[in-house]
Amino acid sequence: MNNELVLKTPDALSIHARVFHPESEVKAGIIINAATAVKQSYYQHFAQFLAQNGYLVVTYDYRGIGQSAIQDTRDPRLTMQAWGEKDLATVIDWATTHHPALDWHCIGHSVGGQILGLAANNTIFKSVYCVSSQSGYWANWEGIAKPRMFAMWYFAVPVLSTLFGKVPGVFLGGEALPECIAKQWA
């Protein structure tokens, strides 16, 4: 069983989350932090698997992404820093308020592992598992990937986000990335 939530951040944005409940006794809670431009629905089958194995799982869309997207893609509140400081912190507050007896763990995919340090209340996690949370710094890449990454960070992302107010999802292979987030990412 799962249910949907709408949580309010300290700066009054709505964060859409989904809670996956186990049918058996709850072993612990897990918060899944998504990758850049990836909707929470991408993790649905994994969250269901974890719930079937006794874990209460929370997935959510960061501000500007998926169900948490807003019309104004140039809103200055849309930053990657806010994903950790406000969005993740809000989800952690909900988790510890509604399920205070549980041990909480976090799975961070890509930037989802990197933003953990930005949430002031991140000390609740008993463990953290990060998947592909490496640096995207262009000079760390090898071969043809190195100039491609350089072009993406210093040309494509800044130009597309300035022209359109976002980087179109088709370019990223995921959701559109609002301008402020895209420029911070680059």
Name each model feature, range by range.
Residues M1-P22:
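N-terminal cap/lid segment of alpha/beta-hydrolase-fold proteins
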